[in-house]
Regions:
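Gly/Pro/Ser/Thr-rich low-complexity, intrinsically disordered segments predominantly at protein N-termini
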Residues: 1-199
């Protein structure tokens, strides 16, 4: 995901501090804002812009998924699609998500039943994505797989939910093909990092 700012921590003049929100107030307030905001059980976080390679990798993944799933009932969405995690009283904007749910396809503004979520890590959000955010994502009954892509190391960590409900880490190193079992897609490093310059 891109950089994440708690509005309470912004300097004066950058943005007006909103009141304490409940979920309905957040949903009514957010469409009128210039930037996207995530909602975490009453707290609101502004989603700052992401760097070039972050956006490029997200697009590469979404494009590969969209092509792969074109003849299926599944749909791929990027970071402008809001995801509700009801158990955490939260709304997020994942970098990429895939849903195969008829309920989600009928809901134009909010998805609730993703099969796959992918986050591209930023230095300011890596710990949050790996920790608190993943713990909330795991509460989604529909979620089968969660992938984290590290732009600096070019490693990808894929977490898969087993039949016993336990999540197992499947790490993929630099240059390795990433397997997304939930959608039966093998994603090569060339596809994943196309048009991304080495630092």
């Amino acid at each position: 995901m891109g950089n994440r700012l708690n509005l309470k921590d912004l300097p004066m003049g950058h943005a007006a501090q909103p009141p304490v929100f409940n979920a309905d107030e957040y949903l009514a307030w957010e469409p009128a804002q210039l930037d996207r905001h995530e909602f975490l059980d009453g707290e609101v976080f502004a989603m700052a812009g992401a760097e070039d390679r972050h956006v490029t990798v997200s697009m590469n993944i979404a494009f590969a998924l969209r092509q792969h799933l074109s003849d299926s009932p599944c749909r791929t969405y990027m970071s402008d699609m809001r995801l509700q995690v009801a158990a955490a009283n939260s709304y997020f904007y994942p970098d990429v998500l895939v849903t195969c749910s008829a309920h989600d396809l009928a809901s134009p503004l909010v998805k609730t039943e993703p099969k796959l979520i992918i986050e591209v890590l930023s230095p300011s959000t890596a710990a949050y994505d790996r920790g608190l955010k993943f713990s909330h994502y795991r509460s989604l009954p529909s979620l089968e797989e969660f992938a984290l892509i590290d732009l600096d190391t070019r490693n990808t960590d894929v977490y898969r939910k087993g039949p016993d409900g336990l999540w197992v880490l499947h790490p993929f190193g630099r240059g390795e093909t990433v397997s997304l079992a939930s959608v039966a897609l093998e994603l090569s490093a060339v596809q994943l990092f196309a048009d991304v310059l080495e630092l």
